[in-house]
């Protein structure tokens, strides 16, 4: 697995995070150092490696200030498997719900997909060539071979012919005639020139087995995996366009070309050494003394999470995985509870703590304009597909930021997420009418913003409905 990103210096990591996330420099520095320490550890001898564990991080800050985005972007920068889980989804072992080990199994699933996607990319040309060969045969088929008659020893018992399931001539063809060879040569040329992309072709694809709905979540998943391994793969015939068929066939051939067992082992190692698990809403399982009944359950979840953070061997469908060197990032607003309300053992497993700042009007302005694909650029690009040009003035952007900030102050503070719904509300009419406005140019001014959002910015009851 290519993990060249792990060799980035902390400054380079922060620089890459700055392309997508505004502010929160302290949090960016801490995650950058954590990533660099992983690279430093990889350079040590085996004995030293085993002694050094990642320093888990606890992010403290209100919703919508960038906690999840920092962790997700960090994982993308280094090509590490990453999952986000919510602590409130877990229950104590023995109760209905997800057990804490499921987050490790989910991480391994992500790791397997990452490794296999990279390995498939290395054989993509060969797989596509095989897919094109198959498409030529499907578009110009030969005569099918007749099913061979084989003696079945059970025939005499049942008084008739018994189909021999060991012989499968379904896909066997007679040798192509000269006429078919000529036609295939012409079809191959047209395929290479892209002239047949929209033509329909019938292919056989593996059918997804139905889910078992009568069991609990984890039981369901484990039983489903067991049944999938025992049951033969069922194929169904579908009629699709050539371009779609090529993707399906190439993906199937790529699966055959890579060493599945080697990929699984590489994925397990990647999850162990580079995996990042983001545990959101960890403050919701912190205990206080106001409700002893709930506190018992919350403490149970914390104590179940603790062994995973300390290092446990978890069984997955790909093999065992050790969590000792995975990086865990806990996050929560901690409005009601405090980090000290977590059980002491769990507090000790998050030695690095960082408080994220609430967002100001200036931060909102930067969020709207600075990131690589900022919200303003996204909406401009979307409307440009309808040949509608939208120009936001600087004053209009500032006015949008002021309204978003004010609504956050007057109602629930949901941080930068407020900008999404404010923008969506403001551009609702334009988005609806855009298909009938070709070549239109629309200037978004402070007056335009006020006209569209006046009722929201002045009516607290109404602004409560703008999430």
From Swiss-Prot:
Per its UniProt record, what InterPro entries does this chain match?
AAA+_ATPase, ATP-dep_Clp_protease_ClpX, ATPase_AAA_core, Clp_ATPase_C, HslU, P-loop_NTPase
- Where does the UniProt annotation locate this protein? Cytoplasm
One cellular component term (GO) for this entry is: HslUV protease complex
- Annotated residues that bind ATP are located at 22, 64-69, 280, 345, 417
Compositionally biased, Basic and acidic residues: which spans? 178-192
Name the keywords, alphabetized. Answer: ATP-binding, Chaperone, Cytoplasm, Nucleotide-binding
Q: Name one GO biological process term.
A: proteolysis involved in protein catabolic process
Q: Where is this region: Disordered?
A: 149-192
The entry's family comment says: Belongs to the ClpX chaperone family. HslU subfamily.
What does the record give as the function of this protein? ATPase subunit of a proteasome-like degradation complex; this subunit has chaperone activity. The binding of ATP and its subsequent hydrolysis by HslU are essential for unfolding of protein substrates subsequently hydrolyzed by HslV. HslU recognizes the N-terminal part of its protein substrates and unfolds these before they are guided to HslV for hydrolysis.
Protein name from the UniProt record: ATP-dependent protease ATPase subunit HslU
**Gene giving rise to this polypeptide:** hslU
